[in-house]
Amino acid sequence: MDYTALRPSSGGGSHGAPLFLEGVIVCWQFADLLDVTLGENLGHFDDLVVVTSHEDRQTAAVCRRHSVPCVPTDAIRGRWRDAFNKGAAINIGLGHLSHRGWLLHLDADIVLPDCFRTMLAKEWLEPECLYGADRLNVVGWDQWQKLKATAVYRRQFQYRCLVQNSGHPLGARLIHGEYGYCPIGFFQLWHGSARRRYPHNCGAAEHSDVVFALQWPGPKRRLLPQVLTYHLQSEAAPMGVDWRGRKSMPFGSSRKTR
């Protein structure tokens, strides 16, 4: 079976219904990575918005290049402009979507597998649930180029029954000591009928995603075992290095964001 050039309408939804997928990405100081990931991810969405600050002109330029709506806001920096209010930015992005189907919050450095909609079609998605996925850490421009040349990247799903790992390290899952599994912010999929909003002010990029996930009871927070995303990193860096603003190197020093 050839899983090439999937159109958004080909994905399945809850109980086999057609799936309508909208997405929101918050991108502040990550235009170099967004330029790469948008090119890989756009075909999976029926609608997608990117939220950034008014000052981040590089992100706005990337959105224009990919013909993606860009929503600038002051809220991304917080009231006193001394924080990264990612939750407020996500809420603003969600306000630009219809919520008539499924919603996916995705980080700017995440690439979805090219068989993503096919894999969603193999899941009995329940509108009452929040779904997370795993990520494979791809460190550096050279590793990314090498990965794209492999058959595993072109088609994770092989023989109609096997999900293949590309051999890259698996990113950590969050298993909370009191609350159990929590889908974290790089990939959170939920149905628009849930009418959930992000915590408004946690001061950085971490924590708000966990608080958001805890709006669903434990049995309703689920991992999609058939979805392996790619987490692009410019360099090996400690966890949280960019949670309060970009500190890591640009992704691919020879690349320019116009």
Set out the residue ranges of the language-model regions.
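C-terminal catalytic/acceptor-binding lobe
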Residues: M1-G11, G16, L33-T37, H176-E178, ...
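Acidic ATP/Mg2+-coordinating residue in the GHKL
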Residues: T52-H54
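Active-site acidic short loop of glycosyltransferases
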Residues: S98-G101, E126
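Short beta-strand-to-loop acidic/aromatic patch adjacent to the donor-nucleotide binding site
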Residues: R100-V111
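Conserved catalytic core of nucleotide-sugar-dependent glycosyltransferases
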Residues: P113-H200
